[in-house]
Amino acid sequence: MPEIDARLREDVHQLGELLGDTIREQYGPRFLDKIELIRKGAKAARRGSAEGAQQLTATLDGLEEDELLPVARAFNQFLNLANIAEQYHRIRRRRPNEPEPFENLVLEELLGRLKDAGHAPGQLARQLAGLEIELVLTAHPTEVARRTLIQKYDAITAQLAAKDHADLLPEERSRIQQRLQRLVAEAWHTDEIRKVRPTPVDEAKWGFAVIEHSLWQALPNVLRHVDEVLLRSTGERLPLTAAPLRFASWMGGDRDGNPNVTASVTREVLLLARWMAADLYLRDIDRLAAELSMQQASPQLLARVGDSAEPYRALLKQLRERLRVTRNWTHQALAGEVPAAEGVLEHNRDLVEPLQLCHESLHACGMGVIADGALLDCLRRAATFGLFLVRLDVRQDSARHAAALSEITEYLELGSYDEWDEKTRLEFLLEELNSRRPLLPAHYQPSADTAEVLATCRAIAAAPPASLGSYVISMAGQPSDVLAVQLLLKESGVDWPMRVVPLFETLDDLDNAGPCMERLLTLPGYRSRLSGVQEVMIGYSDSAKDAGTLTAAWAQYRAQEKLVEICRQHEVELLLFHGRGGTVGRGGGPAHAAILSQPPGSVAGRFRVTEQGEMIRFKFGLPDIAEQNLNLYLAAVLEATLMPPPAPEPAWRAQMDRLAKDALLAYRRVVRDDPQFVEYFRLATPEQELGRLPLGSRPAKRREGGVESLRAIPWIFAWTQTRLMLPAWLGWETALLNAIERGEGALLGQMREQWPFFTTRIDMLEMVLAKADADIARLYDERLVPLELRPLGRRLRDLLSQAVRVVLGLTGQSLLLAHASETRESISVRNSYLDPLHLLQAELLARSRRCRGDACGGLEQALLVTVAGVAAGLRNTG
């Protein structure tokens, strides 16, 4: 079996040694010996040694109160260092005989297959250049690591890269070692837990930092790669202003359930993005001005700058001045309302046009090699990021819009909008949308909640349209939900067709998505308010929490099929926006496989998807990693567009209907119908404590109540911490077993081999089952759950074992992930460091629940460190 690469093992070992040296220096050799005893005990216990398990428990039980935090920190920090080594290993320098990573070759290989399938080279070039892929960065934040630490981790990565050269002199190698030791010590002596929750503005700045430090470099590199691959494969170039990849954001725009995101926050974030963009372009222009010292220029460029000895510098100086004016104005506007100064860049063409003029002139004068260097990179950035860096979406719950309209209709003595049926609502909304008079009198004084809804709409009206993405309506279910937002926007002065996007996110709403959109598209005047495409968002997190992942996945698939069919009938272009989380329980999983498993016709050159929380750092935190993931997106969307998977066979559909029905009953039997379930969940997991974790700006709950009141993220996060991973698999075990007992095993095997949708779901299920651990979950029960609730825990662990058996039978393996031994070994290696954290966490939960008063601070800090450590070890949180 292929083991983990020796170079990766060496990096992990070295970082572990450096961490040990740092801990020894602070706490002495005896303390380090204890940590080593714990690690060895965990490793032996994993191999089935009763003596090892005993030693592990005894050492942990013998820890003094003041040792709990440093022990938790040691294992947490090691797992973070292992993540750094693993992430670097994906992009490390290749040896001469090593194959290139799949991600670097995927596009060229795909273009070859597409040509073999009969696609003309010119068509392929046009299709690739015309792709519209938008990655929407969201905070949601399960990002446990602090930004301060992330910067130190990136610096460690840089030193691992510096070390990866065979020709280093002994002195150079020693210097790198010293720098690594210093950085590991800095990370160790930095508090890994935030003391206060980040504000929505902090979250937005974190998103901008990912662009500044990674995507700003990765994007032009990816497009340069696309250009080279296109030239080799088709003989054509990628057009200068092609922008197949774009970025949007919810940070500072997503107010659903987050009272901290106000209209003034949205305005501030829009201005900060504009400031950041101007600042980044200024750095580019300074570099270009230093490079472009040439004298020879085209007549068109000379006509712009007059008689200048250095015409390129003269033109760039003009652009630099306007960028400075723009940056200075946004800085002033952040302090208060300031009218835009003369010279502020308002339109992207004002940024692109001078750069394009320089590029064309250099080519015309025989200096194409210079034109296609840093100048081309800057042009690519200008076409992609524009003047506003990211397009900001706004999201709000449909109930907030309905409440605002109820208040307005009652004030106008028209009755209560809330109490009207759908027909009455639509009649009112259509009449008001077509009316030329304002709905609200000038002296109207709304309540605070309604004032905030209207202020958000006015903030949209005041912002440049190009700085905004879509207005997403969460918990949408009826056509009136969309028209309500259109009316509120119109009333607030939005005179351009902003995309208003219904988000269907419960099982019932997904089932109703097709009929809802059918009705909407036939309403008088609706089509004229569309901005070219009809965008619809599919919710993965809440539908999975509502119905379980199997039933939700099939409902999402069917909803997309129906939406494709309806939009085709109405000759409207459809853009599906996928609200995926980072974890399987929230629709996560490898993006490449997920895109290729979408229903045929649902991608069609367009793809919009959320990139959430900690996954942003893992997928886009380093430029080289970001390049690999952006390559995968381009290839997958192109393939799903030109070589979509076949429609499922009728027998497969019927089977999915049966599976979904059985899974829904099994899932809800536990989560909704068992009267002990909510109490068990709250006691067996750190769910209550997670609410106190200063992760994001958004509260963990929507309102008081049971599981349905929880947000999808803490729901997943809590089960991940105990390794039961319940939301990701519950329902599958019963549905698959029932199918096998009905004699449908061969049909399931056929679906797994021939239908990408089903294959991807089974692969993701297998991965999550490999990370689940019934023994760890049992430890939490033994420490935290009263005797009368423990039978429920045993039943859930039995269901987990059943899920594992069924998946092994379906895949024909004796071990989970037998086909991916490196991944399996990676999980196994991490378990030696995760197990002590789980044991500590269970103990700390027990102590903190008994604790009262000031003495609890130290316990809570240690507990939060174990939470962060488990999240780091499993590479995901919520």
Curated annotation (Swiss-Prot):
SUPFAM superfamilies: Phosphoenolpyruvate/pyruvate domain (SSF51621). The active site is at residues 140, 545. Transmembrane segments: none annotated. GO terms for molecular function: magnesium ion binding; phosphoenolpyruvate carboxylase activity. InterPro entries: PEP_COase (IPR021135), PEP_COase_bac/pln-type (IPR022805), PEP_COase_Lys_AS (IPR018129), PEPCASE_His_AS (IPR033129), Pyrv/PenolPyrv_kinase-like_dom (IPR015813). GO terms for biological process: carbon fixation; oxaloacetate metabolic process; tricarboxylic acid cycle. GO terms for cellular component: cytosol. It holds the Pfam family PEPcase. It catalyses: oxaloacetate + phosphate = phosphoenolpyruvate + hydrogencarbonate. Gene3D superfamilies: Phosphoenolpyruvate/pyruvate domain (1.20.1440.90). The keyword Amino-acid biosynthesis does not apply. The keyword Lyase applies. Its EC number is 4.1.1.31. It comes from the Bacteria. Keywords: Carbon dioxide fixation, Lyase, Magnesium. It is an enzyme of class 4 (lyase). Its cofactor is Mg(2+). Forms oxaloacetate, a four-carbon dicarboxylic acid source for the tricarboxylic acid cycle. Belongs to the PEPCase type 1 family. This is Phosphoenolpyruvate carboxylase. It comes from Pseudomonas aeruginosa (strain ATCC 15692 / DSM 22644 / CIP 104116 / JCM 14847 / LMG 12228 / 1C / PRS 101 / PAO1). The gene is ppc.
